[in-house]
């Protein structure tokens, strides 16, 4: 019996090989297999958003004007979520709600589910693109792993949170002012700023900004040759012929500043990767908790004492009152379909307001 060792070669290329050759060809803009998911989804998501913000009203879903056509600007235009009565319907154009009528589909909020779902798959396609290119050029896939952070936040906020609530209605609409309203909603109804997962997210994002600034400045500092250039404005001249980067010099500098410093490039850069990605993932987990209506910290003893003693007040009790105000005034106008009417005596009052 003879065993042949060596690379297996096909006599002729099949359809997969032809597709693979074309998709992964070296060109100005790499396509790849991931591009089959990324490019159509990104095109439809961005195109749907521009269409919605330009032409489509939110009168039938939120009682609002939300398009340039109605007088909104870039900060106030939005692609709004469907009405609460539509619950978690995918709102397919050919579905039972719109029945193939494009105008009716837009009025019902179909563009929101269109943008949200294509946007989610577009982001996933972009992460797969980074995996594919890393594999092609023999890199480790840390870029793709890092990009899982933004994907986790997008999916948790725009998809998982409303799935835990009564409908897509409670997701953020796609617009600047709409996102601000959603943030106020999160604070008033979930006390989001006192949620430990939000705290970890803030620490991760702001900590990453600090680390990025420190790292960029340190590398810039050590890219220039020794000499009098360090003491004059010539130190800011970017035309030096070759870099003179020195990890040892940077380590010595920060050792003197803080008493401790990174001595290993890999650990340093992994830390700069780890801080923001972990922060984003923690935020995403927190939003999943909110989908299930899990509560933030409650300091009940302070609330009881504040209720009993008019002279006792903390920043926490003031914020709790403020949240009650947000709920009372926001719910009535934010959910007009509920016909909520709050009599004057139940509206919150106190020093916080």
Curated annotation (Swiss-Prot):
<feature type="transmembrane region" description="Helical">
    <location>
        <begin position="208"/>
        <end position="228"/>
    </location>
</feature>
<dbReference type="GO" id="GO:0005506">
    <property type="term" value="F:iron ion binding"/>
</dbReference>
<feature type="transmembrane region" description="Helical">
    <location>
        <begin position="279"/>
        <end position="295"/>
    </location>
</feature>
<keyword id="KW-0150">Chloroplast</keyword>
<feature type="binding site">
    <location>
        <position position="130"/>
    </location>
    <ligand>
        <name>pheophytin a</name>
    </ligand>
</feature>
<dbReference type="InterPro" id="IPR055265">
    <property type="entry name" value="Photo_RC_L/M_CS"/>
</dbReference>
<comment type="similarity">
    <text>Belongs to the reaction center PufL/M/PsbA/D family.</text>
</comment>
<keyword id="KW-0793">Thylakoid</keyword>
<dbReference type="GO" id="GO:0009523">
    <property type="term" value="C:photosystem II"/>
</dbReference>
<feature type="transmembrane region" description="Helical">
    <location>
        <begin position="153"/>
        <end position="166"/>
    </location>
</feature>
<feature type="binding site" description="axial binding residue">
    <location>
        <position position="198"/>
    </location>
    <ligand>
        <name>chlorophyll a PD2</name>
    </ligand>
</feature>
<feature type="transmembrane region" description="Helical">
    <location>
        <begin position="41"/>
        <end position="61"/>
    </location>
</feature>
<keyword id="KW-0157">Chromophore</keyword>
<keyword id="KW-0602">Photosynthesis</keyword>
<feature type="binding site">
    <location>
        <position position="215"/>
    </location>
    <ligand>
        <name>a plastoquinone</name>
    </ligand>
</feature>
<keyword id="KW-0249">Electron transport</keyword>
<keyword id="KW-0560">Oxidoreductase</keyword>
<feature type="binding site">
    <location>
        <position position="269"/>
    </location>
    <ligand>
        <name>Fe cation</name>
    </ligand>
</feature>
<keyword id="KW-0604">Photosystem II</keyword>
<feature type="modified residue" description="N-acetylthreonine">
    <location>
        <position position="2"/>
    </location>
</feature>
<dbReference type="GO" id="GO:0045156">
    <property type="term" value="F:electron transporter, transferring electrons within the cyclic electron transport pathway of photosynthesis activity"/>
</dbReference>
<comment type="function">
    <text>Photosystem II (PSII) is a light-driven water:plastoquinone oxidoreductase that uses light energy to abstract electrons from H(2)O, generating O(2) and a proton gradient subsequently used for ATP formation. It consists of a core antenna complex that captures photons, and an electron transfer chain that converts photonic excitation into a charge separation. The D1/D2 (PsbA/PsbD) reaction center heterodimer binds P680, the primary electron donor of PSII as well as several subsequent electron acceptors. D2 is needed for assembly of a stable PSII complex.</text>
</comment>
<feature type="modified residue" description="Phosphothreonine">
    <location>
        <position position="2"/>
    </location>
</feature>
<keyword id="KW-0479">Metal-binding</keyword>
<keyword id="KW-0007">Acetylation</keyword>
<comment type="subunit">
    <text>PSII is composed of 1 copy each of membrane proteins PsbA, PsbB, PsbC, PsbD, PsbE, PsbF, PsbH, PsbI, PsbJ, PsbK, PsbL, PsbM, PsbT, PsbX, PsbY, PsbZ, Psb30/Ycf12, at least 3 peripheral proteins of the oxygen-evolving complex and a large number of cofactors. It forms dimeric complexes.</text>
</comment>
<keyword id="KW-0813">Transport</keyword>
<feature type="transmembrane region" description="Helical">
    <location>
        <begin position="125"/>
        <end position="141"/>
    </location>
</feature>
<dbReference type="Pfam" id="PF00124">
    <property type="entry name" value="Photo_RC"/>
</dbReference>
<dbReference type="GO" id="GO:0010242">
    <property type="term" value="F:oxygen evolving activity"/>
</dbReference>
<dbReference type="InterPro" id="IPR055266">
    <property type="entry name" value="D1/D2"/>
</dbReference>
<feature type="binding site" description="axial binding residue">
    <location>
        <position position="118"/>
    </location>
    <ligand>
        <name>chlorophyll a ChlzD2</name>
    </ligand>
</feature>
<dbReference type="InterPro" id="IPR000484">
    <property type="entry name" value="Photo_RC_L/M"/>
</dbReference>
<dbReference type="GO" id="GO:0009535">
    <property type="term" value="C:chloroplast thylakoid membrane"/>
</dbReference>
<feature type="binding site">
    <location>
        <position position="215"/>
    </location>
    <ligand>
        <name>Fe cation</name>
    </ligand>
</feature>
<keyword id="KW-0148">Chlorophyll</keyword>
<keyword id="KW-0597">Phosphoprotein</keyword>
<dbReference type="InterPro" id="IPR005868">
    <property type="entry name" value="PSII_PsbD/D2"/>
</dbReference>
<keyword id="KW-0934">Plastid</keyword>
<keyword id="KW-1133">Transmembrane helix</keyword>
<keyword id="KW-0408">Iron</keyword>
<dbReference type="GO" id="GO:0009772">
    <property type="term" value="P:photosynthetic electron transport in photosystem II"/>
</dbReference>
């Amino acid at each position: 019996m003879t065993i042949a060792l060596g690379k297996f070669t096909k006599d002729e290329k099949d359809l997969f090989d032809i597709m693979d050759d074309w998709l992964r060809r070296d060109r100005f803009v790499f396509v790849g297999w991931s591009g089959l998911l990324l490019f159509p989804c990104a095109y439809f998501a961005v195109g749907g958003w521009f269409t919605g913000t330009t032409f489509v009203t939110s009168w039938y879903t939120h009682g609002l004007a939300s398009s340039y056509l109605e007088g909104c600007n870039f900060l106030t235009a939005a692609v709004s979520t469907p009405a609460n009565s539509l619950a978690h319907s995918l709102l397919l154009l050919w579905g039972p709600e719109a029945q193939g009528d494009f105008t009716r589909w837009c009025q019902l909020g179909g563009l929101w589910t269109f943008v949200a779902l294509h946007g989610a798959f577009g982001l996933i396609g972009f992460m797969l693109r980074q995996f594919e290119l890393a594999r092609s050029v023999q890199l480790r896939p840390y870029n793709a792993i890092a990009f899982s952070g933004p994907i986790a936040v997008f999916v948790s906020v725009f998809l998982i949170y409303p799935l835990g609530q009564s409908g897509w209605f409670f997701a953020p609409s796609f617009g600047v002012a709409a996102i601000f309203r959603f943030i106020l909603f999160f604070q008033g109804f979930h006390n989001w700023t006192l949620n430990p997962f939000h705290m970890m997210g803030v620490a991760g994002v702001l900590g990453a900004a600090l680390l990025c600034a420190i790292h960029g400045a340190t590398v810039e500092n050590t890219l220039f040759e020794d000499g009098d250039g360090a003491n004059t404005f010539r130190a800011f001249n970017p035309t030096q012929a070759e870099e003179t980067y020195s990890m040892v010099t940077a380590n010595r500098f920060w050792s003197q500043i803080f008493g401790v410093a990174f001595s290993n490039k890999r650990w340093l850069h992994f830390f700069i990767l780890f801080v923001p990605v972990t922060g984003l993932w923690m935020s995403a987990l927190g939003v999943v908790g909110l989908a299930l209506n899990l509560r933030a910290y409650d300091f009940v003893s302070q609330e009881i004492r504040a209720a009993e003693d008019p002279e006792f007040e903390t920043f926490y009790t003031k914020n709790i009152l403020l949240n009650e105000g947000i709920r009372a005034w926001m719910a009535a106008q934010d959910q007009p379909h509920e016909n909520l009417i709050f009599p004057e005596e139940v509206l919150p009052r106190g020093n916080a307001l």
